[in-house]
A protein has these predicted regions:
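Bacterial N-terminal signal peptides that target proteins for export
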Residues: 1-5
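Acidic, Ser/Thr- and Pro-rich low-complexity intrinsically disordered regions characteristic
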Residues: 8-9
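C-terminal motif of bacterial Sec signal peptides marking the signal peptidase cleavage site
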Residues: 12-15
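Conserved active-site regions of diverse hydrolases
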Residues: 17-374
Length: 374
């Protein structure tokens, strides 16, 4: 009797300790979630691709599924296609992907997050599959870049981008409103972008059987080193001093409002949808930046990786694929200890370090636990 009881208890404990009931982890998104489409991940590179870990890898560990691998492969510097040898791979995220790819050429390629979701939706979802989705950051960067370029092209690129998601009447009304109207239209564009993603998730995931969907909202891109450098350049070109600082702050406030418009609309679309959890990445990143020591961080503004050049505006550029743990160890700042880069928030000027990715993984895993999805 005691023997049988012990065996039964052991069986129960084993079942409880096995962790998750998740059957598959599927991913769509941009560089933040890319499992290695281009042969590297968008963070500090480990000794191997498998040892280079981003947040989706931490989620895969937590839900006890096989390591993620990229479904697509690079066929050129800016071209991606399905990899016939990777039909079993479930990570469809691609570095550089957008929800709305400017123009039409990329709309049916994996550089479109909507196309990634269509590709994933070609196979029905199981009841215990988890879908992770992240996007909007590159779209926000495109919108900000076009807006800032208005002084050079008279606003042509910005108006053209607005016209991809807004009606001709909305664009005309924005143009008639001058600078204020055009700035306000950016928020309408980002809200429409959220609708694009929500509609595609509805049609290609929820309608295909997905019951556990986690969507990260967009981070405040103005807090990244890329945009801090851009805003500093704006301040300088606007005369510097208080005048330049005020202009830079005005642009940052406008851009932040655009991202918030996207996030608010995304939250609204899924507020009553029990199958979708929207994770507040925007709020979490700002919390990490506001209280870095709480999260084991010290540097919130500078990239850990060295700049490798400059762009046409004279701003620093980075080569994330050559930024390795070995190279950073060899070029450690004075007094820095082993793995010093993990006290930084950013690896290059737009992407997180392994430590930041671990925090992102924790954020998502907490959401999965709260929903009872793991």
């Amino acid at each position: 009797m005691h023997r049988l009881t012990a065996v039964a208890v052991a069986a129960v404990l084993t079942a409880c300790g096995s962790g998750s009931d998740v059957t598959a982890l599927k991913v769509a998104g941009d560089s933040l979630a890319d499992a290695g489409t281009f042969g590297f991940k968008f963070t500090v590179q480990g000794a191997t691709l498998a040892q280079t870990r981003i947040w989706v890898d931490h989620v895969a560990d937590a839900v006890d599924v096989s390591p993620l691998c990229p479904r697509y492969t690079a066929t050129g510097p800016n071209a991606v296609a399905a990899n016939p040898a990777a039909a079993h791979c479930t990570s469809h995220a691609v570095g550089g992907a957008r929800i709305n790819v400017a123009g039409t050429a990329g709309d049916s390629t994996p550089l479109s997050i909507q196309q990634q979701l269509r590709d994933l939706g070609a196979t029905a979802y199981g009841d215990r599959d988890v879908l992770l989705v992240v996007g909007g950051g590159n779209d926000a960067a495109d919108l900000i870049g076009a807006y800032l370029g208005a002084s050079a092209d008279g606003g042509a690129a910005y108006v053209a981008l607005l016209g991809e998601l807004l009606s001709p009447a909305q664009v005309a009304q924005a143009a008639a409103g001058g600078n204020a109207g055009l700035a306000q239209a950016g928020g309408l564009y980002m809200a429409a972008l959220a609708d694009q993603l929500a509609d595609t998730l509805q049609a290609q995931a929820l309608a295909k059987g997905a019951k556990r969907v986690v969507v990260l909202n967009a981070p405040d891109v103005t807090r990244t080193p890329r945009f801090l450098a851009l805003l500093a350049a704006v301040a300088q070109s606007s005369g510097g001093g208080a005048t330049g600082a005020a202009m830079a702050e005005q642009i940052a406030t406008t851009a932040r409002a655009w991202v918030s418009a996207y996030n608010s609309r995304l939250a609204q679309r899924f507020a009553t949808e029990s199958r979708v959890a929207v994770v507040d990445f925007f709020g979490a990143l700002n919390q990490w930046l506001a209280s870095p020591a709480t999260y084991g961080l010290t540097n919130t503004t500078s990239p850990a990786c060295p700049a490798t050049g400059t762009d046409a505006r004279g701003l620093p550029t980075y080569s994330i694929q050559t930024c390795t743990e070995a190279s950073l160890t060899a070029a450690a700042p004075a007094g820095a200890g082993a793995g010093w880069w993990n006290s930084y928030v950013f690896s290059d000027n737009f992407h997180g370090t392994p430590r930041t990715n671990a925090l992102m993984g924790n954020l998502v895993n907490d959401t999965l636990r709260a929903r009872g999805w793991m």
